[in-house]
């Protein structure tokens, strides 16, 4: 079953500010996530039904929440990992 992709409006702005190579990498990963969103290795503690996509080379992270009832993957936050900022932002947006 394929999930639908939605962005929090603030996360969409963060995503649009990124460079094209980083966006393309996230798009590839998001396409995989929409097929299989529950990846145990990427699950985040302390954030209900939230997972991460990380781009190790560039240091960027994307945090998404899986809403099974609506069959939706909701992107909460996109940014650098520095000082766990992307995770703190996602927690505030829940």
What do these predicted ranges mean?
Residues 2-4, 10-13, 17, 24, ...:
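Enriched for short, Lys/Arg-rich terminal
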Residues 17-20, 35:
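Secondary-structure boundary motif
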Residues 22, 26-33:
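Compact soluble domain cores
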Residues 31-55:
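A short, surface-exposed loop/turn module that caps and links secondary-structure elements
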């Amino acid at each position: 079953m394929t999930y639908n992709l939605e962005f929090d409006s603030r996360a969409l702005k963060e995503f649009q500010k990124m460079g094209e190579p980083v966006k393309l990498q996230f798009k590839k990963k998001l396409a995989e996530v929409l097929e299989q969103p529950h990846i145990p290795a990427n699950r985040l503690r302390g954030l209900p039904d939230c997972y991460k996509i990380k781009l190790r080379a560039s240091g960027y992270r994307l945090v998404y929440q899986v809403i099974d009832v609506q069959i939706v993957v909701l992107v909460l936050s996109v940014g650098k990992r520095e000082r766990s900022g992307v995770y703190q932002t996602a927690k505030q947006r829940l």
